[in-house]
Amino acid sequence: KYSFERFGHEVEIMNVEENDFLKDKLNHEILRKGKKTIYRNDLQSFTLLRFLAPQLNNYKDKILVIDPDIFALKDPKKIIEDHSNTSDLSCVFYDNIPRSEMMLIDAKKVKWNFKNIINNLFNFEIDYEDLMNFKFNSDLTINKISECYNSHDKVNDDTILLHTTNRITQPWKEGLEINFFKNNLSQFQIFKEHVKKIIGKSHNEEFISKSFLKHPDKDVKNCIKNLFKEAKELNYFSQEDIEKEVANLNISRKIFE
């Protein structure tokens, strides 16, 4: 929140814990890539709230909707200039697929009904993957914008919005016990990496680690650490706030070292 507010932008947080309708859906089944899976109450449970934003803003104005693990390294105001006025929303594409974790939405045009979308998801009428990449809304016009607005775990001179996409290496969690399910891994994959480690072969520590790991890119780690330190120095949050979040295992003390 601080990384955006320091540029004078108003920020509103959408919280799963404050949305009773969505809370009632947690730990129920959805379709994901054609297979039924549990929509768990973990680090990713907030993702569905992306589709509430236009309604929450009374279908007015252009609004920037981001995941909580996206940080503004520069003022993102230019995104408005890069948005085509004929488009419903603007976002970054990866592998020719639009990404919904960062969207500039023209809320006057995008009339998503959150309850209908969520009910359709949990009634198996929409696949989660189709929801995340907008296939559920075929009439939507999407403006493709630069990756600098959703830079996945890398920083360069052009980066405006940094997205720490790999949950297990998010810098503010380093060293804490992981609190999410590795849905993309099979038990066999995990077992295989354990065996490789035991016999001394090269293995993927992310597959088997029970703790959050150090981010592999020191520039990304330093950017995030600097934002936390800057916010602390400006009394954006108190030492009491920090102690509370550390006690609740939401942040690691390492982020302030």
Report each predicted region and the residues it spans.
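Short alpha-helical segments and helix-capping/turn motifs at coil-helix boundaries
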Residues: K1-Y2, R50-F51, S146-C148
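Short, acidic, metal-binding catalytic loop of nucleotide-sugar glycosyltransferases
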Residues: Y2-E10
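A glycosyltransferase accessory/donor-loop signature
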Residues: G8, N15, K25, K111-E257
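Active-site-proximal specificity loops/subdomain of glycosyltransferases
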Residues: V11-L56
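Short, flexible loop/turn elements at secondary-structure junctions
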Residues: E17-D20, N58, I70, A107, ...
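GT-A fold catalytic core of metal-dependent nucleotide-sugar glycosyltransferases
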Residues: L49-D95, L104-V110
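Conserved hydrophobic/aromatic beta-strand scaffold that supports enzyme active sites
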Residues: A53, L89-C91, S100-L104, I142-K144, ...
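Short, solvent-exposed loop/turn segments at the edges of secondary structure
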Residues: I97-P98, D157
